[in-house]
From Swiss-Prot:
Processing after translation: Phosphorylated by serine/threonine kinases.
Identification of the protein by name: Homeobox protein DLX-2
Biological classification of the source: Eukaryota, Metazoa, Chordata, Craniata, Vertebrata
GO biological process, one term: cerebral cortex GABAergic interneuron fate commitment
Location relative to the cell: Nucleus
Subunit details: Interacts (via homeobox DNA-binding domain) with POU4F2; this interaction enhances retinal ganglion cell (RGC) differentiation.
Tissues expressed in: Expressed only in neural and other ectodermal structures of the head: the brain, the vomeronasal organ, and the preameloblasts of the teeth. Primarily expressed in the germinal cells of the ventral forebrain in the midgestational embryo, and in both dorsal and ventral ventricular zones in late embryogenesis and early postnatal life. Expressed in the inner nuclear layer of the retina.
SUPFAM superfamilies, A to Z: Homeodomain-like
Compositionally biased region (Basic residues): 310-320
Function summary: Acts as a transcriptional activator. Activates transcription of CGA/alpha-GSU, via binding to the downstream activin regulatory element (DARE) in the gene promoter. Plays a role in terminal differentiation of interneurons, such as amacrine and bipolar cells in the developing retina. Likely to play a regulatory role in the development of the ventral forebrain. May play a role in craniofacial patterning and morphogenesis.
Composition bias type Gly residues, residue spans: 253-266
Region (Disordered), start-end ranges: 19-83, 219-272, 304-332
Biased composition (Polar residues): 19-28, 55-75
Swiss-Prot/TrEMBL keywords: Activator, Developmental protein, Differentiation, DNA-binding, Homeobox, Nucleus, Phosphoprotein, Transcription, Transcription regulation
Gene name tied to this protein: Dlx2
């Protein structure tokens, strides 16, 4: 066993000496190529020294094998002299790989320099454009949220103050139509110096305000002439019940005087005439009034059923005066 170990140590020294000699001779390729047989003999001896210790499983042998393996890696040029050993091929590959690494490292360094130069050329554009555009947005968003009693609360924007000219123009357009198309809204906003959002919000508020007043019956047409009229769908029921309801008191009057019926008709017709006089300013009211006139035109169909009652009132109160036919004419 000791003899085998001594032979291994001797072989290790010989391989180290040959590796160092071939490392110095590696810079001269022709001489290295000429020394190929010597390299082959050295590689064969190293192979024999490597294969022998693998057969014995003792610790010193494995340590010697590991040391010879690392010495071959530390001196990769020693294996480059001979191509018979597998370690020689690996040593040459590692040597060329290290050379490629050096080349790629230099190329990478130049590429990095070019990239940084290109990045610095675009740096002024990025720093001047994007942060400037983002900062006002943050400034606009920050004041909208305020912490009140430990809870975030959104602060409302200040109310838009319209001038008298803008209000008059908006009111005139609202009298024409309560809903604006997109081109009309853009044109109106541009002419008044407002944004489209402001015009849209004004029309929405105006419509909601009018609907509330219309439902509650608080439409002061005489006190507030600027108040807009009702929607077209709601205008016919206003005039139609006026004509139909005034006929009911006459039928319910029975033996009442005809002059009283005439008074009721005249008093009932005065609010409708005032409303029609005010609503006549709106173009869409004429369409509604046309439908109302159609309803009034169908009303005379009820004359045959009511004529006996009217004649009865006429004969019964003939001594009081012939006011009943006049009242019937005013109602219908």
């Amino acid at each position: 066993m000791t003899g085998v170990f001594d032979s291994l140590v001797a072989d290790m020294h010989s391989t180290q000496i040959t590796a160092s000699s071939t490392y110095h001779q590696h810079q001269q390729p022709p001489s290295g190529a000429g020394a190929g047989p010597g390299g082959n003999s050295n590689s064969s001896s190293s192979n024999s020294s490597l294969h022998k210790p693998q057969e014995s499983p003792t610790l010193p042998v494995s340590t010697a094998t590991d040391s010879s393996y690392y010495t071959n890696q530390q001196h990769p040029a020693g294996g480059g002299g001979g191509g018979a050993s597998p370690y020689a091929h690996m040593g040459s590959y590692q040597y060329h790989a290290s050379g490629l690494n050096n080349v790629s490292y230099s190329a990478k360094s130049s590429y990095d320099l070019g990239y940084t130069a290109a990045y610095t050329s675009y740096a002024p554009y990025g720093t001047s454009s994007s942060p400037v555009n983002n900062e006002p947005d943050k400034e606009d968003l920050e004041p909208e949220i305020r912490i009140v009693n430990g809870k975030p609360k959104k602060v409302r924007k200040p109310r838009t103050i319209y001038s008298s000219f803008q209000l008059a123009a908006l009111q005139r357009r609202f009298q024409k139509t309560q809903y604006l198309a997109l081109p009309e809204r853009a044109e109106l906003a541009a002419s008044l110096g407002l944004t489209q959002t402001q015009v849209k919000i004004w029309f929405q508020n105006r419509r909601s305000k009018f609907k509330k007043m219309w439902k509650s019956g608080e439409i002061p047409t005489e006190q507030h002439p600027g108040a807009s009229a009702s929607p077209p769908c709601a205008s016919p029921p206003v005039s139609a019940p006026a004509s139909w309801d005034f006929g009911a008191p006459q039928r319910m009057a029975g033996g009442g005087p005809g002059s009283g019926g005439g008074g009721a008709g005249s008093s009932g017709s005065s609010p409708s005439s005032a409303a029609s006089a005010f609503l006549g300013n709106y173009p869409w009211y004429h369409q509604a009034s046309g439908s109302a006139s159609h309803l009034q035109a169908t009303a005379p169909l009820l004359h045959p059923s009511q004529t006996p009652q009217a004649h009865h009132h006429h004969h019964h109160h003939h001594h009081a005066g012939g006011g009943a036919p006049v009242s019937a004419g005013t109602i219908f």
